[in-house]
């Protein structure tokens, strides 16, 4: 909300490329950022229109290129009608993971400078988990990305990981640094890794 200036902040500052975000026009600022949420909202419309948001400046080639880039083309082709498949209200015809993939394609098409993933992988089904992991890596490459996650496999390759407990920072570092300490991150990672081994067996 603050990065998109849905609310104006009273203290501190947020910069984008070294420029205070309050110096940007709202339209330019919001086109420079993309947010992928856990609860993806889709309109009762085709997949294509849900990706482009009916923006006439976005071409079919861009949509197909973005879909390939996040590794979702096979998923789209398996649907009746492909990009013309109607997802119905709130995407009720799709699984949680499939809705997430569409939101990833949408974000890729708009090519934001800053990407925010807010628990975007929290409720995905096993069928699309690997697709989401690949899509996350490809979507975050080469751009500033802020990832809010409880699923630590999502953030393992992040340059910097900040561990919060009730809104307070308790640890900071990359994955290797945090695993080298006997802290909250390492304990949670080991629990999640053990759970994934049991699930796979």
Features from the language model and the residues they span:
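ABC-family ATPase nucleotide-binding domain "signature/switch" substructure
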Residues: 1-6, 30-39, 47-50, 64-72, ...
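C-terminal boundary and immediately downstream tail of ABC-type ATPase nucleotide-binding domains
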Residues: 180-201
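Conserved ABC transporter NBD signature motif
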Residues: 12-19, 29
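Conserved H-loop
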Residues: 73-80
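Conserved coupling/switch loops of ABC nucleotide-binding domains, chiefly the family-specific signature
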Residues: 10-13, 166
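ABC-type ATPase nucleotide-binding domains, specifically the catalytic core motifs of the NBD
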Residues: 51-60, 74
């Amino acid at each position: 909300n603050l990065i998109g200036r849905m609310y104006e902040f009273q203290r501190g500052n947020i910069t984008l490329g070294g420029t205070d975000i309050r110096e940007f026009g709202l339209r330019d600022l919001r086109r420079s950022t993309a947010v992928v949420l856990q609860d993806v909202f889709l309109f009762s419309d085709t997949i294509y229109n849900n990706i482009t948001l009916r923006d006439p400046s976005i071409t079919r080639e861009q949509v197909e290129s973005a879909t390939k880039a996040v590794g979702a083309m096979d998923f789209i082709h398996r649907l009746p009608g492909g990009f013309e498949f109607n997802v119905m209200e709130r995407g009720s015809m799709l699984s949680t993971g499939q809705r997430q993939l569409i939101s990833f394609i949408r974000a890729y098409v708009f090519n934001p400078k800053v990407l925010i993933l807010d628990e975007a992988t929290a409720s995905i089904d096993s069928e699309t988990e690997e697709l989401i992991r690949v899509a996350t890596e490809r979507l975050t490459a080469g751009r500033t990305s802020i990832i809010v996650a409880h699923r630590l496999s999502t953030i393992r390759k992040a340059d910097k990981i900040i561990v919060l407990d009730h809104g307070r920072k308790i640890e900071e570092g990359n994955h290797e640094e945090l695993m080298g300490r006997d802290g909250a991150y390492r304990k949670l990672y080991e629990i999640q890794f053990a759970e994934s081994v049991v699930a796979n067996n």
